[in-house]
Design a protein with these regions (language model features):
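A conserved mid-protein helix/loop that constitutes part of the nucleotide-sugar donor-binding site
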Residues: 2-16, 26, 33-39
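Nucleotide-activated donor-binding/catalytic signature segment of Leloir-type glycosyltransferases, i.e.
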Residues: 37-57
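Short alpha-helical donor nucleotide-sugar binding micro-motif in glycosyltransferases
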Residues: 56-57, 64-69
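Aromatic "clamp/platform" in nucleotide-sugar-dependent glycosyltransferases that forms part
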Residues: 77
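Short hydrophobic beta-strand element within catalytic cores of glycosyltransferases
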Residues: 94-97
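Conserved acidic donor-binding segment of nucleotide-sugar-dependent glycosyltransferases
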Residues: 109-120, 129-134
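A short, well-ordered alpha-helix in the C-terminal region of glycosyltransferases
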Residues: 136-149, 160
Length: 172
């Protein structure tokens, strides 16, 4: 849980999200320098009852935490090629992320996820979409959009490259 993940922005909009979607719960899995600060923010904003900071969890158990969720949110501006987006999609979650060119080909707004602008208001609006009917629709097909990034999908792409190279070599 580092500064570059920009979770403090998610925490800032969380009280308004909670007003719009009263059953929502904000779970942050992991450890890092911002963990205590996020806990303080939750207390100050009066939302600590709906926030869980799990602390560190072994990588092999992370899928259990994805399985507990409905939406995966990332407000990061610097980790936009992270594996977490694809892991969340493969787990059947609607991904809500701050838009960045690095997400092209991974998340298409309204199709394979929900993209947000940089402001708190834009993130809040995107999260409300993610927790609504649109997010539920996206979650139903999220895994199919993650499939090309799977080990199998990667192997198929590598095989296709080799086959093209072999064919080009044969043609001379």
């Amino acid at each position: 849980i580092a500064k570059e993940k920009n979770l403090e922005q998610v925490m800032r909009v969380f009280p308004r999200l909670l007003n719009a979607c009263p059953d929502v719960h904000f779970a942050v899995v992991g450890e890092g320098p911002m963990r205590e600060e996020l806990g303080r923010m939750a207390e100050e904003l009066g939302v600590s009852r709906a926030v869980t900071l799990t602390g560190p969890k072994p990588w092999e158990k992370i899928d259990r935490y994805y399985a507990m969720g409905d939406v995966f949110c990332s407000a990061s501006h610097s980790e936009t090629q992270g594996l977490t987006y694809v892991e969340a999609m493969a787990s059947g979650l609607c991904v809500c992320a701050v838009n960045d060119p690095c997400l092209n080909g991974v998340i298409e707004d309204g199709v394979s996820g929900i993209l947000s602008g940089d402001s708190d208001d834009e993130l809040l609006a995107a999260l409300i979409r993610a927790f609504g009917e649109e997010g539920r629709r996206i979650a139903k097909t999220a895994a199919q959009y993650a499939a090309p990034f799977s080990t199998q999908g990667f192997a198929e792409k590598v095989e296709a490259c080799y086959m093209k190279a072999i064919e080009a070599h044969r043609r001379g």
